[in-house]
A protein has these predicted regions:
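Signature for the C-terminal beta-barrel architecture of outer-membrane proteins
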Residues: 1-4, 12-46, 51-61, 90-206
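N-terminal glycine-rich FAD/FM-binding segment characteristic of electron-transfer flavoproteins
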Residues: 65
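Active-site metal-binding loops of divalent metal-dependent hydrolases
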Residues: 68
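Surface-exposed extracellular loop regions of Gram-negative outer-membrane beta-barrel proteins
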Residues: 71-89
Length: 206
């Protein structure tokens, strides 16, 4: 097997369209997701983004189809990532942002895939998202209910050696997550907001 692989492609079309693709695998994972004939198609993340859409009195900063990341309340209320990151209050790249963005990062267990948007004007801003994606989880042997979500590295059902695990953990759970946030802006730099999200699963959690 080759070592860790991570490939990214980002393309823009005019002022509005942006296409993002990424393929990532850890050491020990299979290279491809499925085959078309003899062609191996790798597991990939993708997003198609339309930017700067003006509709009525709203400016839609981003409308995203595919994989996206979402952050609400500096990550205190909601943030999807496989990696711990402390709250930051720095400038430029070190500042945690608010909203939804195309996602071609290495995050896979908590990756979101679906539809998301972010819009606003001088008085308020709003964001919303809907995601449906598979999750890795530890299942109870007795009834196949979910004991816990798990971040697998590498993501495989194989145990030590060539034997498979007693219960599969890779993509054993389907999750639907939806949510959003609206923030009023009475003064520049001052926000009064309401945020909510909900996650639903196709297996009981015990």
């Amino acid at each position: 097997h080759p070592g860790d692989l991570h490939h990214k492609i980002v393309a823009t079309f005019g002022k509005h369209w942006k296409l993002s693709l990424a393929s990532h695998r850890q050491l020990g994972e299979k290279v491809y997701d499925f085959k078309i004939g003899d062609f191996e198609v790798p597991t990939a993340k993708y997003s198609l983004t339309y930017r700067d859409l003006k509709l009525g009195g709203l400016k839609f900063d981003r409308v995203i189809l595919g994989n996206f990341s979402a952050t609400i309340g500096q990550g205190v209320i909601f943030e999807n990532t496989d990696f711990f990151s402390p709250r930051r209050s720095g400038y430029s790249w070190s500042r945690r942002v608010h909203g939804v963005f195309p996602d071609i990062s290495r995050t896979r267990e908590y990756a979101l895939k679906g539809l998301a948007f972010q819009a606003g004007n001088k008085l308020f801003d709003v964001m919303g998202f809907l995601s449906k994606n598979k999750r890795d989880a530890i299942l109870n042997i007795s009834d196949s209910s979910v004991a816990s979500l798990i971040t697998l590295y590498p993501r495989t059902n194989n145990g030590f050696g060539v034997e498979s695990l007693l219960m599969p953990m890779l993509e054993t759970l389907e999750e639907v997550t939806y949510g959003g946030s609206i923030r009023l802006i009475p003064l520049y730099g001052t926000f009064i907001g309401f945020s909510a999200y909900e996650s639903l699963y196709d297996k009981p959690l015990r």
